[in-house]
């Protein structure tokens, strides 16, 4: 039939449109012109109108095409005709496969639907047949693949099926999956929650007759028991009435497969409930299993019948799974023109970052610098640059200053933020673990993703950070390397992505800051872990009449505002930036849009950063302290880049570098400023500043000298003080040094008034 393929394509496209109606020039014609000759497309449309299959009317200057009937559906029942399919597609498929095998190599076993139709535009009908008859079409395509392989390499490939990727117009959300999709090809995005190691199953059963030797090959389903299936089979040979065939394990086709538990990804769960399902993914050849991250799945929903014959749970038989790490960033890529206009207007405000942080953390009063820093953190994680960009922040504070409220505010507004309590968490719970548990097909080793992997590309808030030392070792590598390596010998070997920013909060060593001790003496965390944080903020609850009055007013106003909203009244307070009224949805879109920007560092920013780094190190050298290292330099760069991103700038400018330095410098002065030397000394962070190290070393040497001069090896305390005083130390400095040496285990007191070196 003339123009038959084009007419089928037009009808198929209209059937997938809402109300089977579309704008000809904008919705249909561009795609059709890419597939067929434009003149033929026009003629095919005219024929369909004259046949009464479609109608055309002009609405607001647009050609609106409506499908009236589908003649092809009336002419043929929904049955797959393999002979007709192969007659039409064999040559095209074989040409495609030979090209791919020649360019990609003999290991290649994937059929890309979209790519195939681009090469053969007249073959759009293949996609529809694949969606309606996925198993039959895949089997036919696999047979053609085997023929092409044999003709090319003069040997038979060891494949049971071809993988199918990039089908057209069958994308659904996991939350939309229902029994209506049973047996049809679908494509959806998901996040992996857990996955088993590779297991083996028989995908194709080879059977023979025990009486005459006739053979039969049969495709086996996931729940089919090969030997039980054989008992119900009859001999295929004419004249043989034998019932019950023998299953031959050696000649039957085996495939590796995984059971994978998946969940609705973040992007789709922002405005809808999360859904989960189990996916069975098969491999022709030994391949790297899929254990974590965001994936795109092409497969067929299948149902396991219950023993009583009722319909059971819905599963997915995956034809292909591929990594798809964009997820929530897709929201930014799909913003409409109005969203982009509002976002760009907001970005033009000179104080955009301060105003955005005021709105984002409006539940918390004060702490402007901390709120700005956390906003920078939100846009720092999840990039594909091959170096750490995530900003890690630690807040050490007196109880009740609002750090938990700040974390809760983040979780409510940004779906890529997760929160855990260190005291109730475990190391494996954070990074992932390999456990043995019951799966659909027997017990199996299962890799369960941890919180840090599930939050890949986002932010993880860890409250009560200092109350569980077990998690420290697990966090060290993740915070720097942004990945998790899991190895269970002989079972599972995987590298999981964990490009997360950590926002941690804890109280000081004794619960509340002691004014008689320096800040660094009250931080109860190991130095190697503290080194991983870009910013460490110290928050003290000081009595201040004006500040306390402001907090009281803020709390009451906040309560009244919530009550008014509950009653359906206006809270009376609006946040407007450059004429744009801000709301939580627009804030999320702004942050997501900013996250995808990858700015370059300008020469002016480079000069500012370099001068600060060099000058601080030079000043420290002159005073005999250890100023800053390459770690702090990395922090400044990450913060400057994030600051530029929040301004929606493609270039890191002077203002970005200056704000980054201001943040780092403020934090260092809070925790690493040594008043005796008058300079920053990063050894002070969870360690000892040089001024104190020198005094401790003097006292330790005095104890050594006295101990070595006595037969009993003891150093009388009175003599220690006398010698130290002659060396220029005060009584308080000697007392502090002795207490420090005792605490770190360098000395001990075997009896009152005497000190001895630890051997």
Swiss-Prot record:
PROSITE patterns listed in its UniProt record: MCM_1, MCM_2
Matches recorded under Gene3D superfamilies: P-loop containing nucleotide triphosphate hydrolases, Winged helix-like DNA-binding domain superfamily/Winged helix DNA-binding domain
GO MF annotations in UniProt: ATP binding; ATP hydrolysis activity; single-stranded DNA binding
SUPFAM superfamilies from the UniProt entry: Nucleic acid-binding proteins, P-loop containing nucleoside triphosphate hydrolases
Keywords: ATP-binding, Cell cycle, DNA replication, DNA-binding, Nucleotide-binding, Transcription, Transcription regulation
The MCM domain, residue ranges: 352-556
Pfam families, A to Z: MCM, MCM_lid, MCM_OB, MCM_WH_arc
Residues annotated as binding ATP: 397-404
GO biological process: DNA replication
InterPro entries per UniProt: AAA+_ATPase, MCM, MCM_CS, MCM_dom, MCM_lid, MCM_OB, MCM_WH, NA-bd_OB-fold
Homology family: Belongs to the MCM family.
Protein name stated in the entry: Uncharacterized MCM-type protein MJ0363
High-level lineage: Archaea, Methanobacteriati, Methanobacteriota, Methanomada group, Methanococci
